[in-house]
Amino acid sequence: MRTVLDIEYKEGLAIDLYLPDEGEVFDLFVYFHGGGLEKGSRRGMRPFAEPLAARGVATASVEYRMYPDAKFPDFIVDCAEAVAYMKAHIGEYGQCRRLYVGGSSAGGYLSMMLCFDRRYLEAVGMKPTDVDAYIHDAGQPTSHFNVLKFSGVDSRRVIVDETAPMYFVGMDEEYSKMLFIVSDEDMFARYEQTLLMVKTLEHFGHKDNVRLSYQHSKHCKYVNKIDEAGESVFANIIMGFLEEVFPEG
């Protein structure tokens, strides 16, 4: 595996890139970390990035602005710019076939916002379907609790407005393939919210584009978990999805 750290994609914000060995054709997974939009880091992704690289998928781990210094939608704008930057520059590191976008927890909220509110990727010269597949891991499909909190609203409220990915479902006729991951012991109401998001997509006729992975775990604990066989649980979830929706390899 090759590692390229601290790639500045805009002033003050960087990406860490984990790549397969030189000369290999690969896919690219642009990943947004969790932390409630107020903490977390792009660092420390090697436990799943290394096995993904061994199976032909590079990982670009993205730094983005967070509360309290940021305000909505700064973090979404940053992530859109990171995706566009990597799409434009990944050829400098080798031959890339496909582009995937995803994230865990708050990162899953961010990947959903890019997937469903087309304005963010359109602002950087892309459209959501330019991404071949999305991996939404335990993200909040309603308005994120910290978006509510920092707007002066009770963070326990369930609100579906323009700050919520679910608000935009059905506004586009076409969606890329996508995977939702959720746990039976996830954050309070996250399991039910995820099922509602999936059912809403199905109601609009997109059942064939959606996959759902259930984990027996606490919230996102599988992301850096190694199973009894010594393999990354998260990498295996991702590769299982990709191999299903892209059987040609």
What is each model feature region?
Residues 1-23:
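N-terminal cap/lid segment of alpha/beta-hydrolase-fold proteins
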Residues 25-35:
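Short beta-strand element of the alpha/beta-hydrolase
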Residues 43-60:
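Short amphipathic alpha-helix adjacent to the substrate-entry channel of hydrolases
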Residues 70-90:
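Alpha/beta-hydrolase active-site loop
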Residues 84-149:
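Primarily recognizes the serine-hydrolase "nucleophile elbow" in alpha/beta-hydrolase
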Residues 126-128, 133, 139-147, 157-193:
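The feature captures the conserved acid-bearing segment of alpha/beta-hydrolase catalytic domains
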Residues 151-158, 184-210:
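Active-site-adjacent alpha-helix of alpha/beta-hydrolase-fold enzymes
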Residues 195, 204-249:
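C-terminal catalytic histidine-bearing segment of alpha/beta-hydrolase fold enzymes
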